[in-house]
UniProtKB/Swiss-Prot annotation:
Swiss-Prot/TrEMBL keywords: Cell cycle, Cell division, DNA damage, Septation, SOS response
Keyword DNA damage included in the entry's annotation: yes
Protein name in the entry: Cell division inhibitor SulA
Domain of life (superkingdom): Bacteria
A Pfam family annotated for this UniProt entry: SulA
Family stated for the protein in its record: Belongs to the SulA family.
Purpose: Component of the SOS system and an inhibitor of cell division. Accumulation of SulA causes rapid cessation of cell division and the appearance of long, non-septate filaments. In the presence of GTP, binds a polymerization-competent form of FtsZ in a 1:1 ratio, thus inhibiting FtsZ polymerization and therefore preventing it from participating in the assembly of the Z ring. This mechanism prevents the premature segregation of damaged DNA to daughter cells during cell division.
InterPro entries recorded: Cell_div_suppressor_SulA, P-loop_NTPase, SulA_CellDiv_inhibitor, SulA_enterobact
Record's comment on post-translational modification: Is rapidly cleaved and degraded by the Lon protease once DNA damage is repaired.
Length: 169
């Protein structure tokens, strides 16, 4: 049955506007799979980028799933980050080869607003497409966390200009 927005309007306009904006943002993000590449020695940068979105997704009634290789999330960190402790689920010590499959299954269920998984290798186009399709089906967001070591980055010559001066010779 269709009813107009006017007939269903609420007397508290700001709340209705806020809810509509939140729903629009959540729907726009659904089906999104994004890779976050960060330096292992600077994990806080990735957290600073993701926490606002994770807080917003935490307002949904669904879970947030963290598939972590070794680290265990501390209750204190989850609470101090503003994430809903009662909606955060973690599976730790997951073998890297199982992370992709677990992400696809979790995204597809629709039980999670966001699924975050750590990958050591880059995904193929086919693997990425499978994640995107699962996120669309489950109306969820997926984040692939990809740590890189500073010494693993390809070495290149620094761009710069060497200025010789006969004043110093």
């Amino acid at each position: 049955m269709y009813t107009s927005g006017y007939a269903n309007r609420s007397s508290s306009f700001p709340t209705t506007t806020h809810n509509a904006a939140r729903t629009a943002t959540e729907n726009a993000a659904a089906g999104l799979v994004s890779e976050v590449v960060y330096h292992e020695d600077q994990p806080m940068m990735a957290q600073l980028l993701l926490l606002p979105l994770l807080r917003q997704l935490g307002q949904q009634s669904r879970w947030q799933l963290w598939l972590t290789p070794q680290q265990k999330l501390s209750r204190e960190w989850v609470q101090s980050s503003g994430l809903p402790l009662t909606k955060v689920m973690q599976i730790s010590q997951l073998a890297p080869r199982h992370t992709l499959e677990s992400m696809i299954r979790a995204l597809r269920t629709g039980n999670y607003s966001v699924v975050i998984g750590w990958m050591t290798e880059e995904l193929t186009e086919e693997e990425h497409a499978s994640l995107v399709e699962a996120a669309k089906v489950g109306n969820a967001v997926g984040f692939i966390m990809h740590p890189v070591r500073a010494h693993a980055l390809p070495r290149r010559q620094h761009s710069g200009l060497k200025i010789h001066s006969n004043l110093y010779h």
